[in-house]
């Protein structure tokens, strides 16, 4: 397949599928399943074609408007390819879970596929112009999926989601327009090279002036970029849109929001913010670490107070993504020794693993919530259940594995990323890491409470005939649970492929 534009095919394929789904009516889910299965196959193929040195491969580059710094430029390394695989898996899970879309199924599944295209484009684009187009392409269908198929309070939830994410997009756009005016380039690679040499800040200062309100212009641009990505992750205090959006969206849509879209923010920090604004982020490292720790601890404590399972898992997602932020901001420090370099590599490997593992586990948990809702007429409160391990032992067992993965139990996928993050972060930012352990303890209490209240104790009379998972549900969930176990036992399957990219990234970042 030498010379075949596989990344373009991967990105355009969902758009073709969306058109077909839109015209297919009640058969739209079948079209979406076939389309997403093809996407997963292509994403896995891309994963096998990565350069062994960790550089960006499968490059596709064509001039569009050179005078405006716009070119069609796609490529992937271990980070991008892993996010492609995650996006493909989560989208397939979401489509498979959406068994009860009776209102305009063609439009629903068409929007899901458009969102998938936006995800793939965001993880492969290497030029700001069309990266931003794909970034926004994921926002629009997500808004309508919440607005049209969400719960009773879907209107305010969708509006809040749109306003927050659009505000973040504006911050990104303004910052990059300033960078373009200073450099005449939107290419991430060229801009990263300028930043590594210290020339980017000089060009920005020459073009836009020394700064204002006591800060250099470059620092303000870094703040704008960080704010844009912080909304998407989300990072405290930009997280307030998330609980309503996650709880009001249909569970299959929530799977996409938490499993894939939230990773766009973390990916943006690694692909764009650190390479271009590493020096500025290092200068703001202490307050950023404070916000990361606040994200970890606040997410965990907020989850304790929730009675709605979707809101419990929503705040738990904030907590888990906070560990990614902890690892990222902890490593933003000049290397003073070989030990520091090893700690940076451990933290970054952990962040990338955590992105994948959280996406897989969180999507699975919201899928299980969808199953509970379908069997109880929409109930999803922690106190609405009890003793389900008796009438539904398979569901209890498989959901229990996903819950223990979220808890970070050794032997499951959720443990590995967090372990590597803390292994690296403790030597780079020991105070922040120590405080963040509180988040681990509180998360354990939350997960164990869910297990105890949902699966243990007496079975309420109305749940005595609660149906266990169907054969189809077991077949669909088995690969997901199997992957959790496989990564937990053999994490090197991912680490060995990602580590060259980690080494390559760290070698080019300047703090």
What are these regions (language model features)?
Residues 61-82, 126-134, 138-143, 407, ...:
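Membrane-interface helix-loop-helix modules in multi-pass inner-membrane proteins
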Residues 93-99, 117-129, 142-453:
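Hydrophobic transmembrane alpha-helices and their helix-loop junctions in integral membrane proteins
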Residues 8-22, 33-48, 84-98, 115-117, ...:
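Central hydrophobic cores of alpha-helical transmembrane segments in multi-pass inner-membrane proteins
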Residues 7-8, 28-33, 105-106, 129-133, ...:
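Short, aromatic-rich membrane-interface segments at the entry and exit
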């Amino acid at each position: 397949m030498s010379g075949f534009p596989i990344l373009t095919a991967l990105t355009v394929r969902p758009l073709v599928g969306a058109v077909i789904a839109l015209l297919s009516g009640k058969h739209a889910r079948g079209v979406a399943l076939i389309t997403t299965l093809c996407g997963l196959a292509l994403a896995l193929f891309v994963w096998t074609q990565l350069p062994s040195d960790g550089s960006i491969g499968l490059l596709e580059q064509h001039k569009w408007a050179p005078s405006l710094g716009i070119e069609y430029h796609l490529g992937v390394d271990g980070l991008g390819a892993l996010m492609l695989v995650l996006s493909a898996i989560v989208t397939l899970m979401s489509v498979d879970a959406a068994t009860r879309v009776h209102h305009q199924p063609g439009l629903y599944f068409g929007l899901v596929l458009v969102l998938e295209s936006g995800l793939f484009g965001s993880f492969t684009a290497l030029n700001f112009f069309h990266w931003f187009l794909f970034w926004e392409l994921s926002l629009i269908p997500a808004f309508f999926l919440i607005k049209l198929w969400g719960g009773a309070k879907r209107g305010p939830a969708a509006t809040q989601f749109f306003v927050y994410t659009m505000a973040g997009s504006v911050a990104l756009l303004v910052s990059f327009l300033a960078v373009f005016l200073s450099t005449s380039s939107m290419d991430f690679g060229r801009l990263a090279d300028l930043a590594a040499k210290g020339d980017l800040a000089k060009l920005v200062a020459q073009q836009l002036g020394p700064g204002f309100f006591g800060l250099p212009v470059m620092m303000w641009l870094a703040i704008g970029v960080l704010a844009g990505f912080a909304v998407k992750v989300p990072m405290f205090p930009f997280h307030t849109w998330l609980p309503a959006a996650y709880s009001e969206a249909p569970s299959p849509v929530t799977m996409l929001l938490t499993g894939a879209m939230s990773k766009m923010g973390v990916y943006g920090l690694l692909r764009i913010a650190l390479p271009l604004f590493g020096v500025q982020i290092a200068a703001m490292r202490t307050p950023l670490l404070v916000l990361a720790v606040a994200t970890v601890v606040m997410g965990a404590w907020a989850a304790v107070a929730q009675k709605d399972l979707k809101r419990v898992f929503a705040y738990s997602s904030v907590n888990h993504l906070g560990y990614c932020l902890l690892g990222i901001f902890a490593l933003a420090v000049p290397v003073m020794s070989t030990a520091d370099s090893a700690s940076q590599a451990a933290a970054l490997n952990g962040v990338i693993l955590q992105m994948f593992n959280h996406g897989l586990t969180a999507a699975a948990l919201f899928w299980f919530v969808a199953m509970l809702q379908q069997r109880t007429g929409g109930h999803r409160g922690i106190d609405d259940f009890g003793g389900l391990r008796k009438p539904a032992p398979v569901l209890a067992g498989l959901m229990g594995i996903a819950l223990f993965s979220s808890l970070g139990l050794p032997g499951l996928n959720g443990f590995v990323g967090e372990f590597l993050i803390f292994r690296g972060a403790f030597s780079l930012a020991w105070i922040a890491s120590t405080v963040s352990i509180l988040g681990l303890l509180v998360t354990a209490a939350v997960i164990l409470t869910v297990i105890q209240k949902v699966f243990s104790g007496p079975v309420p009379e109305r749940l005595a005939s609660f149906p266990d998972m169907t054969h189809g549900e077991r077949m669909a969930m088995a690969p997901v649970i199997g992957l959790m176990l496989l990564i937990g036992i053999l994490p090197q399957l991912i680490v060995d492929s990602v580590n060259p990219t980690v080494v390559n990234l760290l070698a080019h970042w300047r703090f």
